[in-house]
Design a protein with these regions (language model features):
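Feature marks short, highly hydrophobic, charge-poor N-terminal signal-anchor/signal peptide-like helices
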Residues: 1-10
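Amphipathic hydrophobic-ligand
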Residues: 86-90
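Non-cytosolic coordination micro-motifs
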Residues: 15-74, 104-174
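Hydrophobic/aromatic beta-strand elements that line small-molecule binding cavities or substrate pockets
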Residues: 92-96, 156-157
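Short beta-strand segments that buttress and anchor functional surface loops
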Residues: 78-85, 107
Length: 174
């Protein structure tokens, strides 16, 4: 009888420890301090590539996220959420749909007001820390991370019209 009690207590302890120490999956991540901190392979802040157009619209509504416009079809369309001034250093997060499926997420990083000199290098370091992996390719204009199903690219671009430098983070399927 004592043996059964011992094994029962050990089993109960194992279950409790598993529940406490099991990390939450990326799908369960709802919000974080910033969209950059919410980057995962295949998604950002709970939105995942392949999610349906309707699901994303309902998620925007549920999370009370203001979006710029709604295309009723979801075919070859874009929704912009989290506009300027909602998060530090973020101009916008764009969700791109094809055939009613989320195919790409683009984060437009704003660093003009902060006056940070090497935001590109800082973002490379930050994304490496978040993803817990090094980039597969990096140069002075772009850096890429890859997983078997998706990839993340950090672009550094100069816009000739405004004379500003912009940084875009794109999450897409492989």
């Amino acid at each position: 009888m004592e043996v059964f009690l011992f094994f029962g207590a050990a089993l109960l302890l194992a279950v409790v420890l598993k529940v406490i120490f099991t990390p939450r999956s990326a799908k369960k991540v709802v919000m974080s301090s910033n969209p950059i901190d919410g980057i995962r392979f295949g998604g950002v802040m709970g939105f995942m590539l392949g999610d349906s157009y309707e699901f994303c619209l309902s998620r925007f509504k549920h999370l009370d996220i203001a979006i710029d416009y709604q295309d009723k079809t979801g075919d070859d369309s874009m929704i912009m959420g989290w506009g300027k001034n909602q998060y530090n250093n973020i101009n916008a997060v764009r969700f791109i749909f094809e055939q009613k499926k989320l195919v790409s997420i683009v984060i437009d990083v704003d660093f003009s007001e902060e006056g940070i000199r090497d935001m590109y290098g800082i973002l490379i370091s930050r994304i490496c820390r978040i993803l817990k992996t090094e980039p597969m390719m990096s140069d002075s204009k772009q850096t890429a991370w890859a997983s078997p199903k998706s990839g993340i690219i950090l672009f550094k671009r100069f816009t000739p019209i405004s004379g500003d430098e912009i940084l875009l983070i794109q999450i897409g399927s492989m």
